[in-house]
Swiss-Prot record:
Protein's GO biological process: L-arginine biosynthetic process
PANTHER family linked to this entry: N-ACETYL-GAMMA-GLUTAMYL-PHOSPHATE REDUCTASE, CHLOROPLASTIC-RELATED, N-ACETYL-GAMMA-GLUTAMYL-PHOSPHATE REDUCTASE, CHLOROPLASTIC-RELATED-RELATED
Protein name as it appears in the record: N-acetyl-gamma-glutamyl-phosphate reductase
GO molecular function: N-acetyl-gamma-glutamyl-phosphate reductase activity; NAD binding; NADP+ binding
Organism: Bordetella petrii (strain ATCC BAA-461 / DSM 12804 / CCUG 43448)
Any Pfam family matching the protein: Semialdhyde_dh
Functional note: Catalyzes the NADPH-dependent reduction of N-acetyl-5-glutamyl phosphate to yield N-acetyl-L-glutamate 5-semialdehyde.
A GO cellular component entry from the record: cytoplasm
EC number(s) reported in the record: 1.2.1.38
Length: 354
């Protein structure tokens, strides 16, 4: 499906009933260059979207439909806010029709098919399409994203870890010990999705704080693969995710040991220079302590750099809204770049406080 730059982008969403799906609807319904044409859900076929999500009353007039009824091949781009495995099953047909794909699941995140199959317990349906897909972290892959037909939208934890560590590793930087990196990450419960699950029941998640996936989490290989691309070699990463009793928000505390020859580096200046031209990345003043509420419902990601007592340990604090910059907002940012629009189109919402 060819797209004329002076017309609105025809957008379809597969899997519009989960949290990332409704977040896509919220953002795209306000986008000045988008026409929402299809939102699919087999279970809710025929139900008006606004009946399920009353925050969209007056904004989205569509009803959910099955993928067969939705004519997705008539769209310029289709977002998949679905479980792993769905996008790759439909990718060939959509690409043949000229429709571009942005997958918010993991089908096109990991370039190594064996790694994908080991962690997601399914064969990859289209290794040829995977080979041409682009990892959609705009701040690291801007040029490739702009030319892509298929985007693997990054996971929420990887977004914070990669953007938090990139200035220390990219372009041959030899600033920190790449074998002892630590990512201590916390997420609100919306990151687990909308499915019924005991661990995210109110009585389980409220007034509670716990680690999970310590022995192995699916985002670990994704983070490692991208860090190794940045560093140009193997990295050692300890990644520990936690669930905290809030709905939205992610806070990642990253630890890196400074190499002896880099002890004189001004790391605050390094980060400020690296992200000076990035619309959504805010490097906070030295000594800052970011709070997740400062990015709630926005596409901003904030970074604070700390070096306790001027020693050899660098601590990088990173916050984002896991549903926006960590998922749907980042997907829209990718779409904007793919269609030659300003990256901030439809994404300049100010965070909500309190």
């Amino acid at each position: 499906m060819a797209h004329a730059s002076n017309s609105r982008i025809k957008v379809g969403i597969v899997g519009g009933t989960g949290y990332t799906g409704v977040e896509l609807l919220r953002l795209l319904s306000q986008h000045p260059h988008v026409e929402l044409t299809a939102i699919t859900s087999r279970k809710e076929d025929g139900l008006p979207v606004a009946d399920m999500y009353p925050n969209l009353r007056g904004r989205v007039s569509l009803a959910f439909s099955t993928p067969e009824k939705a004519n997705l091949a008539d769209c310029d781009v289709v977002f998949f806010a679905t479980p792993h495995g769905v996008a790759m099953a439909q990718a060939q047909e959509l690409l043949a029709a000229g429709t571009r794909i942005i997958d918010l699941a993991a089908d096109f995140r990991l370039q190594d098919t064996a790694t994908f199959e080991r962690w997601y317990k399914m064969p990859h349906a289209c290794p040829d399409i995977l080979a041409e897909s682009v990892y959609g972290l705009v701040e690291l892959n801007r040029e490739a994203v702009s030319k892509a037909r298929v985007i693997g939208n990054p996971g929420c934890y990887p977004t914070t870890v990669l953007l938090g560590l990139a200035p220390l590793l990219e372009n041959g930087a030899a600033l920190v010990d790449t074998q002892t990196l630590i990512a201590d990450c916390k997420s609100g419960v919306s990151g687990a999705g909308r499915k019924a699950e005991v661990s995210t029941l109110f009585s389980e998640a409220s007034d509670n704080f716990k680690a999970y996936g310590v022995a192995g989490h699916r985002h670990h290989p994704e983070i490692s693969e991208q860090l190794e691309k940045l560093a140009g070699g193997k990295v050692g990463l300890t990644f520990v995710p936690h669930l905290v009793p809030m709905i939205r928000g992610m806070f990642s505390t990253l630890y890196a040991r400074i190499r002896p020859e880099a002890l004189g580096t001004d790391f605050q200046a390094l980060y400020e220079k690296r992200y000076a031209d990035e619309h959504f990345i805010d490097v906070m003043p030295a000594g800052s302590l970011p709070e997740t509420r400062s990015v709630r419902a926005s596409n901003n990601l904030r970074i604070a750099v700390q070096r306790p007592n001027g020693g050899d340990l660098l601590i990088v604090l990173v916050i984002q809204d896991n549903l926006v910059k960590g998922a749907s907002g980042q997907a829209v940012q990718n779409m904007n770049l793919m269609f030659g629009l300003p990256e901030s189109a439809g994404l300049d919402q100010v965070a909500i406080l309190p």
